[in-house]
C-alpha cells in the first residue's frame, strides 16, 4: 500500500494487476487501483478535481485531468473517508502513476493534496513463456 498525507488528509492507494484483462500477445496490460481518502482534520473538505501523471515502462507520460473521481465530488466531514476503484491500461508490462486532488474547504479555500506515486507491475514482467 502507498500512502501520502497532506493537510491532515490521508490518501492510500493499492494497485492490483488484472491478468484477465491483459494480453501480452496484444501488448496490453491492465491494473485496477483502489484509493481511500480519509479526512483526519477538523474541517469539512470537498474533492473538486483530479490530476494524474501516468508513466509507462519506457518513460512515455500521459497526463489526465478531470472533475471529481469516478463521477463524484465527495464531501468529507472530519473523520469520514471515501473509497473508490478505477483502472488504467498500459502498453508496457510496468509503469507508475502519481498525482494530486484539488480540494476545497468549507470556507472556499482551494488546495492540492498529494496522491502517492505507486508502481504498476505485472507478475511476469511481460515475458512470454514458451512450453
Curated annotation (Swiss-Prot):
Pfam families: DUF525. Coiled coil: none annotated. Residues 3-127 form the ApaG domain. It comes from the Bacteria. GO terms for biological process: error-free translesion synthesis. SUPFAM superfamilies: ApaG-like. InterPro entries: ApaG_domain, ApaG_sf, Uncharacterised_ApaG. PANTHER family: F-BOX ONLY PROTEIN 3, POLYMERASE DELTA-INTERACTING PROTEIN 2. HAMAP family: ApaG. This is Protein ApaG. The gene is apaG.
